[in-house]
UniProtKB/Swiss-Prot annotation:
This is Immediate-early protein 2. The keyword DNA-binding applies. Belongs to the herpesviridae IE2 family. Residues 428-437, 1195-1213 have a biased composition (Basic residues). It holds the Pfam family Herpes_IE2_3. Transcriptional transactivator. The gene is U90/U86. One of its GO terms (molecular function) is DNA binding. It comes from the Viruses. Interacts with human UBE2I in the nucleus. Although this interaction does not promote IE2 sumoylation, it represses transactivation activity. Residues 339-350, 583-595, 640-665, 955-965, 1162-1177 have a biased composition (Polar residues). Keywords: Activator, DNA-binding, Host nucleus, Host-virus interaction, Repeat, Transcription, Transcription regulation. Residues 1-21, 223-242, 339-370, 428-472, 517-965, 1005-1068, 1086-1179, 1191-1223 are annotated as: Disordered. It comes from Human herpesvirus 6A (strain GS).
Length: 1466
């Protein structure tokens, strides 16, 4: 149908045209209802009908037939009421409807022959005159039209329908004018979803019949005084001021219509913030990148060029509707506008999270019942409200997934581009299709819908593949899209294995074996916390760290294998951290049988809107720990082996262990730090805040071990995370474990009393814990933990604790454990106590062993004997371990012992030892806590979080291999549920994940963000050393290390893993803490880069174990020699990481896959991480006092300068230097604090780039004796030295332009009717005031047509040179010969040997296509130049053969010239 001419604002013609109008019955009824309610109820009519007119002063009485541009008549409310009542009384129902539509803006008076569509836009007529609509040759931006159409929140719009009654859908290309598009809405009332605009990114129109009145009221209540021009994104880009990433011209999130004015200067990018059309279609007219030139036709203040843009209403800013989304939606499911309004509360992550979660919970049922039918994908660049999640869900069920081809390539090992993520997305998509086939299941797993255990059973009854697929599908349904939107509710399904870590084939095999061993019934045995919060999704940045999610779903594996995958990811510690920890993160770790998939209650608010990976996926695979849980009476050797192997796997694959062991899994879930890994006690210790809450582990690992009883641990951990451990389960588990652990612990404690006590305690503790853990955890995990604990604890503790514990191992162990537990308890009584026990055990591996032994001993022996043994063992162990092995041995022992012994002893001695040891540990811990409490108290919250974080990092680190094993079948493992997956239309372009963002940034704009670094860097000794030093320094100095760690997560090929691990660690730490104060790491917000090696070293440090302790000692000596071997670097990393771990500066994590492989056992044990981190903090101080830290000695010997610089630089963000004179340096620029690899070390070894530059500058300054202040302008050698500093001018060294000369010059330029041969040059200095003025000037200029304004740019200056008379004479002679001779014979080979300098004086060039525009531009610029004569200077210059900057203006100039010539002759 061809629309007739719209009649513009002639509202009187509506009555005539209404003759042909057949109102929709439903619409008619709705409008009548509105009118009746408004007239009969207390609600005023104008409030209902005119929600937006009054705010704009655009109340349009019907009498105003011709509304001039600035003469909009304002009618009073009484007039409107009278008018409405009059109309109601006057006519029939049609009259009433007509009046209502006219007044409410539902009626669009565009002249359409057969039907009159209803338009939402109340202001459409006044804004756009009839002439504008009809004759506007410039195609209006459809988005503007769409925006105008959506002004009214009711959005009750009718499709034009033929006289025959059939609805007609108009595509954008068919519309007569872009401004008319709102009138041809894509709502097909008859066909619902069938007809949509496909060519333009329209947002679905809202259901016109749904909640009209409520929508009016909501719109009335919206805060119009708030500037909604800028949608709020959870990730504010750097310097984004709460707006989108305007500072990155390449950002796909950039909204071209947000702000009409450019960022005036200091942008190194192409184009303007809002005007960068380089990636936009050319069909948008230039004027729409500025304020439209509708001054005469637009009374609407939204289009008023002279009003402050900040006062624009949310209606104008397009923020009310996300029309960057191109998708069709079922009109029945379309939500009202209110969900699009970014409220101030939404800007606050916590508030928004809470609101959204509440809303989502409230809407769970309705959402679950909704049918996900949309076939389109959404690209979200804002945080959707809970209401909008329905649409997102639908989109997730879409069959079409816009994945780049390269994303589906078979090779998923590419770390630079997260192809695996895309593959996983693709797989997920396929699984989604499968899921669609089972649509009922899809609905069942709403994001907020918690599936019942019966549901889980039903799923389990399905094929394991289907189970995994279903879980992945359910989880991915929302998570990928929502992951960048941290405030949205979590996906319904929890995946236990959200670790980014990929296991090497041997590791995987081992894990697989363990899983098969534990295949018993993880599903039945593993309680999964319902409220498992998802691991924080750092918007896109966090996704970057969750590569392991791709690994999740090995959809083809049997449930056990699926679990193994999940566990594998968990074993990475990352996944466990996410999954298990996530559960705890919510703060409510409700243990539910694994059968019942853990349902995501919207607990993401706990994680600051970050998505915690659901633990659900854990359930399918029986955990070896589940199996071990029962065989608490394993042979000591077998248990030992199990603990060693499990420790190994769990340390590497702590998530596996935690997952495999239902208890461990619960623990990890409960503990949020996935401390479930091999040493459950360590888990508790790591999670000690949680474990202590169980209070079975009061100060000894025994309590932590209390966790080991699967139920007890899970509950205790859960409750620990909740601070409400289930004592009953802990008692039962402690009883069962206390029996076996009491035996082993009695042996261990008896041995711990002697030198062998350290070894034996490590063995016994590992045995007993291995028994307990074998009971709790799978045999494999118990083997691993026993191996690891036996190795590390027997070695480190045998050395350290054998020495000390041989002296008074029982005394020291009790003292150390009591001290550490006191410290920890003082830090966080329950958390701290668990940590303290873990720390005590952690401080001295002998402490840990002594703890375990003292725990078991206290159980077996008596409370008194447990006290004495704990004292002696803790003393000796604390002494020995506190020195050198404290960190490593505490890590290893805390892992092995903490896990095994803490499990077994926590069960067995949880009561007795928890009581006795709690008493002794409280006493001793009160002492030690007096020391550590100051540290702990200052760091208590941070430490707890950090410890948790470190633990999760540890676990994550060793197994953290970004490269997925082929054995896992990358194609199926590559599900990265949630945070890591973005379903954006242009996934690659919009993807802003940690490791994969770099390629989308122009490095010139983000010079500090480098593309993925080489793996070699991660393995560098330098990096490991620096990371060690960093860890050490942070460990000592900063309670904020966790935060720093987040910062440190950075992109690098190898660091991607580490970043994922770090991310997981964070999420784990967040989860464990259950606190929101640790905001998820946001990639964009992190400016510092940690070299991959540093991150790997930090992760390695987290993963340090007993064996690591030994190696640390060895390494200490080697480090002094600056060991370069990988093992040395690994050990260094381990040592550093112990320090670092305690420091919580896991942010240094340079989790190279190598590092993960190096410390598979050590890194993976999350428990040890906490113990070690807390212990290491204590131990660091002790070690520093007693013996120089390995890190310290090594760093001091080789990297004193480097370390200091690194420490300083780490916290500093490098500024982007535009100095062209420093191009060489620019290429070398690194994020501050990042250690250079040997290949990158330039002049001074191992200096971060910033320090290198500073040192260089210092040397140059010393050479020229330059100090702060001015330098004589005649001393060219000083001025043009090798420096990065710019010439700074507070006052511009130019004279203002003489007004008379300026006017004459402008007159002369414009006399011939051409201005393209002239330009305006603006010079201005650098200051905030000037910058603001220049921005305003730019706005004023860009409002005008035919104006071209350049970016403000700097200039690079070569040194000056005086020419002597001879050279000048030669030039004069050539000049006299004529231009040709001058050109041909001229030769000038003069050069200089100095350095160039740039100045901070900025320059801007303005062109105008016509003399009218030129004169106006000059006047505008001169106004600001006059106001700031010392900072802004104007120059007008002529251009030889000048032409317009772009050819678009050529016809304009020619047309003006021709008319000018013709008219000037008249």
């Amino acid at each position: 149908m061809e629309p007739a001419k719209p009649s513009g604002n002639n509202m009187g013609s509506n009555d005539e045209r209404m003759q042909d109008y057949r109102p929709d019955p439903m619409m008619e009824e709705s409008i009548q209802q509105i009118l009746e309610d408004s007239l009969m109820c207390d609600t005023s009519f104008d409030d209902l009908i005119l929600p937006g007119l009054e705010s704009f002063g655009l109340i349009i009485p019907e009498s105003s037939n011709n509304i001039e541009s600035n003469n909009v008549e304002e009618g009073s409310n009484e007039d409107l009421k009278t008018l409405a009542e009059h109309k109601c009384k006057q006519g029939n129902d049609n009259d009433v409807i007509q009046s209502a539509m006219k007044l409410s803006g539902l009626y669009c008076d565009a002249d359409i022959t057969h039907t009159q569509p209803l338009s939402d836009n109340t202001h459409q007529d006044p804004i756009y005159s009839q002439e504008t609509r009809i004759f506007s040759k410039t195609i209006q931006d459809p988005r503007i039209a769409a925006q105008t159409h959506r002004q009214c929140t009711s959005s009750a719009s009718n499709l034009p329908s033929n006289e025959s009654g059939s609805t007609q859908v108009r595509f954008a290309s068919e519309l007569p004018n872009q401004l008319l598009q709102p009138m041809y809405t894509s709502h097909n009332q008859n066909a619902n979803l069938q007809n949509n605009f496909t060519s333009l990114p329209y947002q679905p129109y809202h259901d016109p019949y749904r909640d009209i009145e409520s929508s009016y009221r909501e719109s009335r209540n919206t805060n119009r005084g708030y500037d909604y021009n800028f949608r709020h994104h959870s990730y504010r880009p750097r310097g984004g001021n709460g707006k989108y990433n305007y500072y990155n011209p390449n950002s796909k999130y950039q909204q071209p219509y947000k702000r009409c004015f450019t960022r005036t200067y200091n942008r190194r990018g192409r184009g303007h913030r809002s005007y960068d059309c380089s990636d936009r279609s050319a069909d948008l007219p230039y004027e729409h990148y500025t304020y439209p030139n509708y001054e005469q036709q637009n009374p609407d203040p939204r289009m008023n060029n002279y009003k402050d843009f900040t006062q624009l209403t949310n209606k104008f800013n397009f923020g009310a509707n996300d029309y960057s989304m191109a998708f069709s939606t079922d009109s029945t499911h379309v939500q009202s506008d209110n969900y699009n309004h970014p409220t101030k509360a939404q800007t606050i992550p916590e508030t928004t999270k809470t609101k959204k979660h509440k809303a989502t919970k409230d809407n769970e049922t309705s959402r679950g019942n909704q049918v996900l039918t949309s076939n389109d994908a959404i690209s979200l660049s804002y945080r959707p409200s809970p209401i909008k999640l329905d649409i997102i869900k639908k989109i997730y069920d879409t069959d079409v997934i816009p994945l780049p081809k390269e994303a589906l390539t078979a090779n998923g090992s590419n770390r630079d581009v997260d192809i695996q993520k895309y593959k996983k997305a693709h797989i997920r998509c396929r699984s989604v299709q499968k899921k669609k086939e089972r649509s009922s299941q899809t609905n069942k797993h709403d994001e907020n819908h918690a599936s019942s255990r019966s549901d889980l059973k039903e799923r389990k009854s399905n094929e394991h593949e289907d189970k995994a697929v279903t879980k992945a599908r359910d989880f991915s349904k929302l998570d990928p899209l929502l992951s960048p939107l941290p405030l949205t509710p979590e996906p319904a399904i929890d995946f236990a294995d959200h670790t980014d870590k990929f296991y090497s084939t041997p590791e995987f095999n081992q894990i697989k074996q363990n899983l098969h061993r534990s295949k018993t019934s993880l599903q039945d045995t593993v309680p999964i916390s319902k409220h498992t919060p998802r691991a924080p999704t750092k918007d896109n940045s966090y996704k970057k760290h969750h590569d392991s999610k791709d690994n999740y779903p090995k959809m083809k594996h049997s449930p056990g294998r699926t679990t193994s995958k999940k566990n594998t990811t968990n074993s990475n510690g990352h996944q466990n951290f996410k999954d298990v920890s996530v559960k705890n993160v919510s703060g409510k770790a409700t243990s539910t049988s694994p059968k019942s998939k853990t349902h995501h209650y919207s607990s993401s608010s706990d994680e600051e809107g970050q998505y915690k990976s659901p633990v659900k996926t854990i359930t399918p695979s029986p955990s070896p720990y589940c199996k071990l849980k029962n065989p608490s009476i394993m042979d000591k050797n077998s248990a030992k082996n199990h603990t060693a192997s499990a420790d190994k796997n769990l340390t590497d694959n702590s998530p596996i262990r935690s997952n495999l062991n239902p208890t461990a899994f619960n623990k990890s879930n409960n503990n949020k730090s996935i401390t479930n890994s091999t040493s459950n006690s360590d888990e508790c210790t790591d999670k000690k805040p949680n474990c202590n809450s169980t209070k079975n582990e009061s100060k000894d690992p025994n309590r932590t071990c209390g966790k080991n009883s699967d139920k007890h641990l899970s509950k205790s951990c859960t409750m620990a995370s909740k601070r409400a451990p289930s004592r009953a389960s802990s008692r039962t588990s402690s009883r069962a474990s206390s029996r076996a652990s009491s035996r082993a612990s009695s042996r261990a404690s008896s041995r711990a009393s002697s030198r062998a006590s350290s070894r034996d305690s490590s063995r016994a503790s590992s045995r007993a814990p291995s028994r307990a853990s074998s009971r709790d955890s799978s045999r494999a995990s118990s083997r691993d933990s026993s191996r690891d604990s036996n190795r590390a604890s027997s070695k480190a503790s045998s050395r350290a604790s054998s020495r000390d514990s041989s002296r008074a191992s029982s005394r020291d162990s009790s003292r150390a454990s009591s001290k550490a537990s006191r410290k920890a308890s003082s830090r966080a009584s329950s958390r701290a106590s668990s940590r303290a026990s873990s720390k005590a055990s952690g401080k001295a591996s002998s402490k840990a062993s002594s703890r375990a032994s003292s725990r078991a001993f206290s159980r077996n022996s008596s409370r008194a004997s447990s006290r004495a043994s704990s004292r002696a063992s803790s003393r000796a162990s604390s002494r020995a371990s506190s020195r050198a092995s404290s960190r490593d041995s505490s890590r290893a022992l805390s892992r092995a012992f903490g896990r095994d012994s803490s499990r077994a002893s926590s069960r067995a001695s949880s009561r007795d030892s928890s009581r006795a040891s709690s008493k002794a540990s409280r006493k001793a811990s009160s002492r030690a806590s007096s020391r550590a409490s100051s540290r702990a108290s200052s760091r208590a919250s941070s430490r707890e979080l950090r410890q948790i974080y470190c633990d999760s990092n540890k676990r994550q680190t060793p197994p953290h291999d970004t490269s997925i094993n082929t054995k896992f079948e990358i194609s199926e493992i590559k599900f990265r549920c949630g945070e890591d997956l973005n379903f954006y239309k242009n996934t690659a372009a919009r993807l802003q994940c940690f490791n994969h963002n770099d390629q989308f940034y122009n490095p010139r704009f983000r010079p500090h963000i480098r593309t993925n670094r080489k793996k070699s860097e991660s393995t560098n000794d330098t990096d490991s050393e620096s990371s060690m030093s960093r860890c050490k320094s942070h460990c000592r100095n900063s309670p904020d290390s966790l935060t720093i760690v987040r910062r440190k997560k950075h992109k690098s090929g190898s660091s991607s893993i580490s970043s994922s691990i770090e991310e997981n660690c964070r999420s784990n730490s967040h989860i464990v803490t259950g606190k929101e104060k640790f905001t998820p790491f946001y990639y964009q917000s992190s400016r510092t880069r940690s070299s991959s090696s540093s991150s790997s070293s930090s992760s390695a440090s987290l993963s340090c174990s007993k064996s690591t302790l030994k190696t640390c000692r060895k390494t200490q000596n080697r480090d002094n020699k600056q060991i370069k071997s990988k093992s040395d670097s690994k050990h260094k990393t381990t040592n550093m990481s112990s320090d670092y771990e305690s420091n919580r500066h896991a942010d240094v994590f340079r989790n190279s896959p190598e590092a993960g492989e190096k410390f598979p056992l050590h890194n993976s044990s999350p428990f040890n991480t906490h113990e070690q981190s807390n212990h290491s903090e204590n131990a660091i101080d002790e070690e520093q006092k007693k013996a120089p830290n390995i890190t310290t000695s090594h760093l001091h010997q080789k990297q004193n300068v480097k370390l200091h610089n690194t420490k300083k630089c780490k916290k500093k963000r490098p500024r982007d230097d535009d100095s062209d004179s420093s191009i060489k340096n620019f290429c070398k620029k690194r994020i501050s604090g990042a250690q250079k690899t040997e290949s990158e070390v330039s002049e001074i070894d191992d200096l971060c780039y910033r320090d290198y530059v500073r040192l260089k500058e210092r040397k140059v300054s010393e050479k020229f004796k330059i100090h702060r202040g001015r330098v004589a302008t005649k001393d060219f050698q000083k001025l043009f030295r090798n420096t990065m500093r710019a010439f700074e001018y507070k006052q511009i060294p130019k004279k203002p332009c003489n007004d008379k000369n300026l006017k004459e010059a402008v007159y002369n330029i414009c006399c011939n009717g051409l201005s393209n041969n002239a330009a305006i040059i603006m010079y201005f200095t650098r200051s905030k005031k000037v910058a603001q003025n220049i921005k305003i000037m730019q706005k004023e200029l860009m409002i005008r047509p035919n104006i071209t304004v350049s970016e403000a740019f700097k200039m690079n200056h070569a040194p000056p040179k005086y020419y002597d008379k001879d050279e000048i004479k030669r030039f004069i002679q050539l000049q006299k010969q004529g231009p040709q001779e001058l050109w041909d014979k001229f030769e000038n080979n003069t050069t200089h040997d100095l350095f160039t300098r740039h100045s901070d004086v900025k320059t801007m060039i303005i062109y105008a296509a016509t003399p009218i525009d030129f004169v106006g531009a000059v006047k505008t610029c001169n106004k600001y130049a006059k106001d700031n004569p010392k900072e802004i200077v104007l120059r007008v210059c002529s251009i030889i053969d000048g032409d317009n900057p772009i050819s678009i203006y050529n016809p304009i100039s020619k047309d003006f010239k021709s008319k000018f010539s013709t008219l000037s002759k008249c």
